Regions:
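Transmembrane alpha-helices and adjacent helix-loop boundaries
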Residues: 1-323
Length: 323
């Protein structure tokens, strides 16, 4: 293993160790820990949305729908299906099932993307978000518009950090693979990509599935942190917040996704004294970003740590000296 990879794995292990040890040691107060968990959940959401909106160049505005599906499925499992004693040991599996349910919904949404792009796809995904919210509001077993509660507080800083690292690792490997080059080709020119034998339908399908899966996982983490969810938590306003984080950090950038999520989450918390007015900040920031800096802070740029290692230089051939 190269020195660079050793540093990456060492950094990941250090983050996990701190996420495990700091809450137990009492070095951080519960308020700071909760903010860090919200930052991590938003990082997962932003990374997943950036795969579709940034790397593939589509414009999806219904990501909160996937988050809501994952949140409700995971919550039903821990409240109504699993015995209480099994909830904590099964929590990783619960999150995966919630993510898988969201991925199935992503499969449904991916089909309109085969024929529509830009504004038309935005309308389709917006309609999907509204449908999910409406369906959740009209299922009495899920609490209807009043919401669903009773979930155990299983989300910890360690689990959030672990999923952030896993999401980042998987997406980093994907975007620098043939898959990543394929979805980038779709972003640049889908017609040309089709002509060069890129299976655009298959790549779009996979991109939506992966993006929706991680949004569903983030929803499960969110539900078991807040211990209460309602359909309004996954409205178009939540999707707008995700768009702000993506375009603030920068499209087509893993580093930008992390920065955008951290900056926006902390900023909203600092503006808490403004009350309801702080929710104006997200839409306003999105408008200003689209006008003055549509590429975001790190648009199409990446920190060296997340870039693939450069190939080793070929050994120089020894001169031929003849027989």
């Amino acid at each position: 293993m190269s020195r660079r990879n050793w540093l990456i794995w060492l950094g990941a292990a250090t983050v996990l160790a701190l996420a495990w040890g700091l809450p137990a040691s009492g070095a951080l107060n519960p308020y700071v820990i909760q903010i860090l968990m919200y930052v991590g959940i938003n990082m997962i959401l932003t990374l997943s949305l950036n795969l579709v909106n940034g790397y593939m160049g589509e414009f999806s505005v219904g990501h909160a729908g996937f988050m809501g599906i994952g949140a409700y499925v995971a919550s039903v499992l821990t409240v109504a299906v699993l015995p209480p004693a099994w909830a904590a040991p099964a929590f990783p599996a619960v999150l995966i099932v919630g993510g898988a349910a969201a991925a199935v919904a992503g499969l449904v949404v991916s089909y309109p993307s085969f024929r529509t792009r830009g504004d038309y796809l935005a309308i389709v995904t917006l309609a999907f978000n509204m449908i999910v919210k409406s369906v959740l509001e009209n299922i009495p077993a899920l609490g209807g518009p009043r919401g669903y509660l009773g979930m155990p507080r299983l989300t910890t800083l360690f689990w959030v950090a672990a999923w952030v690292i896993l999401t980042l690792w998987i997406l980093r490997n994907l975007v620098y693979s043939n898959f990543g080059r394929g979805i980038t080709a779709i972003r640049e020119d889908e017609v040309a990509a089709n002509l060069t034998s890129v299976d655009t339908r298959r790549l779009k399908l996979y991109a939506f599935l992966i993006s929706a899966f991680f949004a569903g996982v983030a929803g499960g983490l969110y539900a078991h942190l807040l211990q209460f969810i309602n359909p309004r938590s996954f409205s178009i306003l939540k999707s707008t917040d995700m768009l702000v984080m993506v375009y603030l950090g920068g499209v087509g950038s893993l580093t930008g996704s992390l920065l955008g999520a951290a900056i926006f989450t902390v900023l909203l918390e600092l503006l808490r004294p403004l009350g309801l007015w702080r929710w104006v900040v997200g839409p306003l920031m999105l408008v200003l970003l689209m006008i003055f800096r549509p590429q975001g802070l790190m648009g199409f740029k990446e920190a060296g740590l997340f870039k693939p290692a450069p190939p080793a230089p070929a050994a120089a051939a020894s001169p031929w000296r003849g027989p």
